Amino acid sequence: TVRYASPTNFEMEVVERSLNKITYKIPTGSDFEVKNNNLTFFEKSPFSGENYYTYTANGECYCNVIHRGDEVFRTLRSPTKNAFKIKKTGDHTVECRYFVSPKFKVGDVVAMSRNKLRDNCGLFFENCSDIFCERLTVNYMHGFGWLSQMCENLSFDKLTFKPASGYRVSSFADLIHVCGCKGYVKITDSHFEHPHDDAINVHGAFLRFRKACDERTAELEFVHHQQGGYKAFYSGDKVKIYSRTDLSELDGVYTVDSTDDNIDKKTVIVKFKEKLPPMKPEMYVFENITYNPNLTVSGCTFNAIPTRGILCTTDKESEIFGNTFKSVGMPDILSLIHI
């Protein structure tokens, strides 16, 4: 079982509510303080006594999820937003006063996260092959969740993702997150519940075209602030090119000859065996289709998912069957780009 002593989603349960005041209960494993009318969560190292992190809940925290039993949904509302007075009333309780209380209900658990900051992973596979994961229980993961990147042949069987006792959130973001993998990805007979984002997310990577170095060579870049820091192309890989405006494919598949990576700058110069078509800078993206997997998801249950049950973006064959979806806030299955 994978557990966290102090999960990095910050949960506040509504235990009392009136027109101008709400009392919230915070799980026993989450340390916090109220100072200068600010609510700050933190976790201390048992070795150095220094904080691993601090997070001050504020009105800018928009990435919140309300857990109302198994009904879950994203919200812009926050326990601390518009609170003119915040007071610690017990070891695990906080009172917030408002001109008008936000429309939470008694029993609601409001789960907050550090906005867009996903600086790590709960579990991480990179450049691995023939991995088989079986009969694991995951109570919580930080960052991207369980991330597999540039791997080949992954199997996940009889896994259970559920929050630990006393908590409502099982992952800071996605549960199983597959980015740029090849061969197959098989996810079978597993249970997914209460993440802060998607249950399963399978996708490749688009690198933006910066400039042509010559007729066979292009400089590409990672643009998304949450992506980069790894080698995305290898000699012999097959690549497709898409227009950024409508994601239509350009004719042809291009074969990687060699690469020159600048990991820190999130750029790569790729030499291809074929001549490249004429392209305007920043108007096209390149995808390594060799690192798109065949996907199988079967016999799984999905419950209390605030976003998508399965988000699938691969141009290989996908088989999704025999699954059960309940209380999914967005599409149960969303397939993008490659249909």
Locations of regions flagged by a protein language model:
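Short "repeat-start/strand-capping" segments in structured domains, especially the N-termini
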Residues: C128-F132, Q149-S155, C181-K186, P293-T296, ...
